[in-house]
Amino acid sequence: MKICLILILFIFNIGNVEAQIKENDTVIKIKEIRLNKEKYIGKPLAVLLADLKIKPVKIISGSPANNRNVINTTDFHFRSDLNNYYISILWQEHITNKEIKKIEKANKYKATNEEVNIFKECIVKDVF
């Protein structure tokens, strides 16, 4: 009977133990970029992407409420395991919306080299 009781207590205690979760490379890289964002502010997105070394799987751009013809932010989504992570970029200069929105809709927001290349020369104002 004692063995049964000890075994039951042991099983319940295992459920309460929190395992240390190791962060994967994608999470580490994204956190690194956010922590060192000063390195990328005022520079083309190409600098950030070169350091990141991970291709985005989805790109979603946003417009300010008062002007839907331009883009002022873009979210670059990355996938690792079953989780999605993203980096948001606020652009120094507004980007013309027409061409980018057409690409995003045609590809259902999946990242393409064509779209990434458009953003590479755009200057980063902030990273979050």
Labelled PLM ranges:
Residues 1-24:
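Bacterial Sec-dependent N-terminal signal peptides
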Residues 21-128:
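Residues within mature, well-folded domains
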